[in-house]
């Protein structure tokens, strides 16, 4: 039976409650925030909640259904991201539809541990100052290499705005990642070191009709694999594909005939997928175009940021520095891509030498928690607040991807005549929310968005999972309710700059589904 776990770190209580009727996925995450956190609370207040909600299809035999929504209140209304790795499927396989963590642990740092029906809160001394990799190794050494972990590292301990979560992968290399869009300051403020799930199943979520779900899941997999981006360019050439599409929607790179995708020369088992059930594969396949291979998409993003901000460096130096920054950022639990943009601003303002040595020294300042390091760890927004009179600085402050969404011109099919009054941009956002509600990887959006047959399959998969018949229209209507609810939360915050929190990946979708 699916349930919601409510964990209060202040009084160390653990409670359960029923899943609200008709709520699932990202929509459920926002509902839990409203129910269990104090409206108007500050981002780092004990009154805030840290919520993890697997997608409705996560934990089932559905391709690319590997995601969970992570959310909390924020000074800008709310913070929300989508994570993958081995945690979402194992959490769902334990029958946990939502995890709510509130309060603040006052006796050092703690971990929340789940194993079957057992749930515990306990202190984890001796991990302060350790890198994320060392934290993962310590936990897996004690609780087994098959346990799934999300948590915070040194950057989260300092509650830096650029801190992120680390999320483990199944056993292999890489061991973990720090998603760029995640946030580690909220769990860091609760003194929550890690959430640990011990479960030997990835596909243990209850399904009303598992046989039919597996059959329809195979049909969905075929749509994804047959797509030229999801089944060709992404697994073959990696995130360089995304960089091409940002420039031109038709610039889908092709792997030269007879040439195999680049592979890193590493010993031991390699993870090519972030979680079991992924049919795309985005790990250890990302070529820089010059033979250099990135182990994960995040590394390619750091390299792209380096090329944008430090283009005067040689290609070899860009590769070397980007790799070093990415690894160091991962070890700290720091958003290395945003670090590059912020450090570039700081170097210019402080009139420092624009060299790779300067850049590498600044990330060590952040690791030490020095004044310059903490300032850079605050992101471009922190520097922007120091220079409100400088338009050139304000233009470089990172904004949400959909800040100027009203200027976008999309070209989508009218999937459902009953919803003919919905604009194309709203329709795009609703389809993104359907994927997040169901737990589907955003990379599969190239194959699934704007396709009636994909919408029908997703509706059938919902029915197989729950036993309740729904139509594509109902999925879109629920997504619309989720969008409206989030807009209301943002409206309550005077600091909110956008009505909706849409994944950064939407920049690519704007281009791909935009008008010519």
Question: Language model features by range: what are they?
Answer:
Residues 1-180, 184, 189, 193-199, ...:
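Protein-protein interaction/assembly regions in multi-subunit complexes
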Residues 7-8, 14, 24, 140-516:
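Extended C-terminal regions of large enzymes
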């Amino acid at each position: 039976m699916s349930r919601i776990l409510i964990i209060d770190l202040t009084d160390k209580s653990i409670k359960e409650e029923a899943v609200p009727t008709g709520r699932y996925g990202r929509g459920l995450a926002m509902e839990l925030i409203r129910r269990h956190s104090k409206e108007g609370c500050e981002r780092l207040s004990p009154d805030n909640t840290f919520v993890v909600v697997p997608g409705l299809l996560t934990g089932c035999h559905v391709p690319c259904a590997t995601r969970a929504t992570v959310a909390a209140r924020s000074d800008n209304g709310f913070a929300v991201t989508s994570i993958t790795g081995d945690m979402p499927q194992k959490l769902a396989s334990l029958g946990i539809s939502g995890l709510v963590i509130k309060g603040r642990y006052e006796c050092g740092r703690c971990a929340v541990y789940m194993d079957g029906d057992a749930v515990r809160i306990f202190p984890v001394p001796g991990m302060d100052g350790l890198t994320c990799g060392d934290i993962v190794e310590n936990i897996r050494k004690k609780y087994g290499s098959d346990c799934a972990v999300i948590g915070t590292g040194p950057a989260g301990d300092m509650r830096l705005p650029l801190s992120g979560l680390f999320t483990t992968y199944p056993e292999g290399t890489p061991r973990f990642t720090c998603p760029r869009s995640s946030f580690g300051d909220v769990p860091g403020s609760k003194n929550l070191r890690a959430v640990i799930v011990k479960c030997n199943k990835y596909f243990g979520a209850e399904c009303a009709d598992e046989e039919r779900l597996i059959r329809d899941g195979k049909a969905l997999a075929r749509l994804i694999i047959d797509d030229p981006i999801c089944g060709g360019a992404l697994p073959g050439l990696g995130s360089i594909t995304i960089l091409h599409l940002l420039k031109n929607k038709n610039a889908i790179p092709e792997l030269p005939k007879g040439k195999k995708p680049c592979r890193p020369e590493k010993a031991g088992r390699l993870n090519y997928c972030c979680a079991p059930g992924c049919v795309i594969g985005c790990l250890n396949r990302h070529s820089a175009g010059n033979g250099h291979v990135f182990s994960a998409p995040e590394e390619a993003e750091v390299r792209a940021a380096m090329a944008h901000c430090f283009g005067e460096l040689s290609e070899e130096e860009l590769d070397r520095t980007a790799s070093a920054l990415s690894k160091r950022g991962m070890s700290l639990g720091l958003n290395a891509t945003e670090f590059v943009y912020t450090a570039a601003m700081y170097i210019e303002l402080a009139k420092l030498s624009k060299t790779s040595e300067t850049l590498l020294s600044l990330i060590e300042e952040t690791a030490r928690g020095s004044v310059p390091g903490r300032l850079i760890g605050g992101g471009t927004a922190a520097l922007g607040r120091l220079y409100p009179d400088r338009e050139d600085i304000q233009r470089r402050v990172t904004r949400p991807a959909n800040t100027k969404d009203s200027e976008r011109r999309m070209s989508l099919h009218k999937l459902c005549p009953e919803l003919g009054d919905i604009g194309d941009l709203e329709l795009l956002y609703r389809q993104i929310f359907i994927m997040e509600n169901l737990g589907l990887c955003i990379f599969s959006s190239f194959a699934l968005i704007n396709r009636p047959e994909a919408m029908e399959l997703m509706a059938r998969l919902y029915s197989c999972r729950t036993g309740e018949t729904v139509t594509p229209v109902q999925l879109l209507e629920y997504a619309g309710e989720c969008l409206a609810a989030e807009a209301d939360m943002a409206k309550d915050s005077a600091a909110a700059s956008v009505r909706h929190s849409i994944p950064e990946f939407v920049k690519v979708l704007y281009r791909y589904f935009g008008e010519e």
